[in-house]
Amino acid sequence: MTNRLVLSGTVCRTPLRKVSPSGIPHCQFVLEHRSVQEEAGFHRQAWCQMPVIVSGHENQAITHSITVGSSITVQGFISCYKAKNGLSKMVLHAEQIELIDSGD
């Protein structure tokens, strides 16, 4: 089964960094995406806020460069988890992160 997602956007919540009891570092943040997409010959506004989690030592160096307002592209897979309120929430598990140069 294929489960791949590539999403570009702007970090809209302060990254939360934690280390699990087993010593695995995690970084969580929310990525906001806004674009215009074509569907059935019409242009449509696309918008979402996607929770992202980055786990493991491999990507932790780049997570320290991520702040609110950072423009990034994230590649990974999606999964659901049950929130404290009992509702299912989708999250993007990042496997690759690229900072987008703002051109400044």
UniProtKB/Swiss-Prot annotation:
The keyword Transferase does not apply. One of its GO terms (biological process) is DNA replication, synthesis of primer. Residues 1-101 form the SSB domain. One of its GO terms (molecular function) is single-stranded DNA binding. Keywords: DNA replication, DNA-binding, Primosome. Signal peptide: none annotated. Pfam families: SSB_1. It comes from the Bacteria. Involved in the restart of stalled replication forks, which reloads the replicative helicase on sites other than the origin of replication; the PriA-PriB pathway is the major replication restart pathway. During primosome assembly it facilitates complex formation between PriA and DnaT on DNA; stabilizes PriA on DNA. Stimulates the DNA unwinding activity of PriA helicase. Belongs to the PriB family. HAMAP family: PriB (MF_00720). This is Replication restart protein PriB. It comes from Shigella dysenteriae serotype 1 (strain Sd197). The gene is priB.
